[in-house]
């Protein structure tokens, strides 16, 4: 994950991109064909982040497109129920809401099968953007799935441009899903510019400072490499280091990274000076790791996102 931008004050976190339905097997360690049943769970990384923010007491909005179908209106209702501003949502009458079947291996890690050819989120156009909402963002968060095809790619780039011109802090989590890209080379082309997942970009399984810093560019304020239960590595212009994670009983890792991001953004939207203070940043990242860890203890992303009190309880208990 990378964060860059200009000074900001307390305000709104706008999350841009996809929201969909995840179908998760009721048992772990089986293929999709072998699964006896599936649990329906709302998901989509940008939407997960938006709800993670409000679950922790922050203020967020979602910008994207859903199908004008039962699933689409259900997802919009979930956002509203969780306190996320929904003024940026559009509905498409000609395309369905995206679906994803998620295979859970015995260790809780995932494999994906997507149904979105095309889905409504892919059809968002620049003219449909709520520009006033985007201009009001103090943090503008996005992923890479919305960069894959037109017209959503143009809408994504327009939204980024408007947010940047308005002085928002830009937050990027690649959320790499190779099955959605036409090729690995095409995926690299899009994410290389924005600094992304270390192993994929460098072609190395080495997680070290040298590899991470190959992603650095002068406009970045913070670069993060998350390491699952091992925590994360952080890099700024002035310092770098690591923060340990938490050992929990992992059921499903879906949404853990989104929970981490939501926690981080909730803390820094009110005080960007945290990014200049290593001790305070480490506290925030430790809190973010706790949120990510809790999210892995239940099936599905949004139902598992923690409250602040739950995260603080885990922090007090240690790792």
Curated annotation (Swiss-Prot):
Q: What InterPro entries does the record point to?
A: Carboh/pur_kinase_PfkB_CS, PfkB_Carbo_kinase, PfkB_dom, Ribo/fructo_kinase, Ribokinase-like
Keyword annotations for this protein, in alphabetical order, are: ATP-binding, Carbohydrate metabolism, Kinase, Nucleotide-binding, Transferase
Q: Which pathway does this polypeptide act in? A: Glycan biosynthesis; starch biosynthesis
A single GO molecular function, which one?
Answer: ATP binding
Hydrolase among keywords:
no
Tissue and organ distribution: Expressed in swelling stolons and, at higher levels, in developing tubers. Low levels found in leaves and stems from tuberizing plants.
Superkingdom, taxonomy of origin: Eukaryota
The record, for Gene3D superfamilies, names: 3.40.1190.20
- Reaction catalysed by this enzyme: D-fructose + ATP = D-fructose 6-phosphate + ADP + H(+)
Q: What is its EC number?
A: 2.7.1.4
Q: Which SUPFAM superfamilies match?
A: Ribokinase-like (SSF53613)
Q: What class of enzyme is it?
A: transferase
Provide one Gene Ontology cellular component. Answer: cytosol
A GO BP entry is: starch biosynthetic process
State the family it belongs to. Belongs to the carbohydrate kinase PfkB family.
Role summary: May play an important role in maintaining the flux of carbon towards starch formation.
**Listed name of the protein:** Fructokinase
| Species this chain originates from | Solanum tuberosum (Potato)
Lineage of the native species?
Eukaryota, Viridiplantae, Streptophyta, Embryophyta, Tracheophyta
């Amino acid at each position: 994950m990378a964060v860059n931008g200009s000074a900001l004050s307390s305000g709104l976190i706008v999350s841009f991109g996809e929201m969909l339905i995840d179908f998760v097997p009721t048992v772990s360690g089986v293929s999709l064909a072998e699964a006896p049943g599936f649990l329906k769970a709302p998901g989509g990384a940008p939407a997960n982040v938006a709800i993670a923010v409000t679950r922790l007491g922050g203020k967020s909005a979602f910008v994207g497109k859903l199908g004008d179908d039962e699933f689409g209106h259900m997802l919009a209702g979930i956002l509203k129920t969780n306190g996320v501003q929904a003024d940026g949502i559009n509905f498409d009458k000609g395309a369905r809401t995206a679906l994803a079947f998620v295979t859970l291996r015995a260790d809780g890690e995932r494999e994906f099968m997507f149904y979105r050819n095309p889905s409504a989120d892919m059809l968002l156009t620049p003219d449909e953007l709520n520009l006033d909402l985007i201009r009001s963002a103090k943090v503008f968060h996005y992923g890479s799935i919305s960069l894959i095809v037109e017209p959503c790619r143009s809408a994504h780039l327009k939204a980024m441009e408007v947010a940047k011109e308005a002085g928002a802090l830009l937050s990027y989590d690649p959320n790499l899903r190779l099955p959605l890209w036409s090729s690995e080379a095409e995926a690299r082309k899009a994410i290389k510019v924005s600094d992304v997942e270390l192993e994929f970009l460098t072609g190395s399984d080495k997680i070290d400072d040298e590899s991470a810093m190959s992603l650095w560019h002068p406009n970045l304020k913070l670069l993060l490499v998350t390491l699952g239960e091992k925590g994360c590595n952080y890099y700024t212009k002035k310092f770098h280091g690591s923060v340990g994670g938490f050992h929990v009983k992992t059921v499903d890792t879906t949404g853990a990274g989104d929970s981490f991001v939501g926690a981080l953004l909730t803390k820094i939207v009110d005080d960007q000076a945290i990014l200049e203070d290593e001790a305070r940043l480490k506290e925030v990242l430790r809190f973010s790791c706790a949120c990510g860890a809790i999210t892995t203890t239940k099936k599905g992303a949004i139902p598992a996102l923690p409250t602040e009190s739950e995260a603080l309880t885990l922090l007090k208990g240690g790792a």
